[in-house]
């Protein structure tokens, strides 16, 4: 449903020349999830992709739980029939999953080549994985999936390692077979330094060794422990990309999806800023990459300005906010 307005509505047209935008003290990157729009978004002024979400590709282009494909022969006849209809034309269920991931990642990687494209490995929560075809057979029922079986904990678990291996295979094909070495890896929701060590080791086992062929492995800085122990986490990664959404929720102890307390959600809260400053300073001291890909800078230009003052390397924005935020930062900090 929509709205019907009586009479001719007034509107304003704002034109900007994107080929002559003023210089900035940091780089503007973009958050891109939809491979179908990648070449459109690449026409905007940018320094690459600070966040490419695998979840969008899995949801939009695959729609099937990876375990249901790995264990296709063990599924009941009804599920096999449903899956067969979805994977028609592919060599095998597993090849369907990998090939579709490759298609999505390569679309974004090639659209922005040779600029960096940081691909975040899947960050579905258990309830989101359960919504995929066959997913309800494999996912636990959790009271609070936000704090549950996700991120690095999921990758290194015995029950999901073979699923994570499919994502790694897709990244390898994009980088090695297609030559898109601009595609880099990002790991979300790393709770402890031990997990950091384990997940980087697992990547190496899967053929994605940090530093080999120029591969950078970035970590999402989105758990308070990441900022508090930034020096230790950075021993295992080439830098941080701050996820301000989860970091804010976990710092303030709130669920931003709760209508009762959602008004308290603000990335500009002083407690959040203290953690952000700690992470930025630690990365700068080590000469490591430090960027942000959370929603905050897209929603609040003044927050983006504050991040610039802290010395952040890159701010990754939603495509529809790139021009306005660029102009704001140029005026305030150019």
List each model region and its residues.
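Beta-strand/loop-dominated core regions that host nucleotide or nucleotide-derived cofactor-binding catalytic loops
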Residues: 8-9
């Amino acid at each position: 449903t929509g709205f019907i307005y009586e009479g001719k509505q007034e509107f304003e047209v704002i034109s900007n020349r994107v080929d002559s935008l003023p210089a900035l003290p940091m780089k503007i990157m973009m958050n891109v999830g939809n491979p179908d729009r990648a070449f459109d978004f690449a026409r905007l002024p940018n320094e690459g992709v600070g966040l490419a979400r695998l979840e969008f590709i899995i949801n939009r282009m695959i729609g099937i739980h990876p375990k249901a494909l790995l264990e296709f022969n063990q599924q009941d006849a009804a599920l096999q029939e449903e899956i067969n209809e979805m994977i028609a034309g592919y060599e095998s269920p597993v090849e369907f999953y990998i090939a579709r991931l490759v298609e999505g990642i390569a679309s974004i990687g090639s659209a922005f080549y040779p600029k960096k494209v940081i691909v975040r490995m899947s960050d579905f929560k258990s309830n989101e994985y359960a919504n995929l075809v066959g997913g309800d057979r494999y996912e636990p029922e959790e009271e609070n999936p936000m704090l549950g079986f996700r991120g690095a904990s999921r990758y290194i678990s015995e029950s999901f390692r073979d699923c994570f291996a499919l994502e790694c295979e897709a990244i390898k094909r994009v980088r090695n077979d297609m030559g898109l070495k601009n595609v880099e890896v990002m790991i979300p929701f790393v709770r402890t330094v031990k997990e950091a060590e384990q997940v980087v080791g697992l990547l190496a086992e899967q053929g994605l060794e940090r530093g080999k062929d120029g591969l950078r492995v970035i970590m999402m800085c989105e758990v308070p422990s990441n900022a508090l122990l930034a020096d230790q986490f950075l021993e295992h990664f080439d830098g941080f990309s701050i996820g301000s959404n989860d970091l804010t929720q976990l710092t303030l102890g709130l669920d931003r999806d709760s209508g009762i307390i959602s008004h308290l959600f603000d990335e500009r809260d002083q407690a959040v800023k203290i953690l952000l400053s700690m992470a930025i300073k630690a990365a700068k001291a080590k000469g490591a990459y430090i960027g942000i890909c959370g929603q905050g800078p897209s929603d609040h230009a003044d927050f983006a300005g504050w991040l610039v003052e802290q010395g952040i390397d890159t701010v990754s924005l939603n495509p529809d906010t790139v021009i306005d935020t660029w102009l704001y930062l140029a005026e305030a900090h150019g």
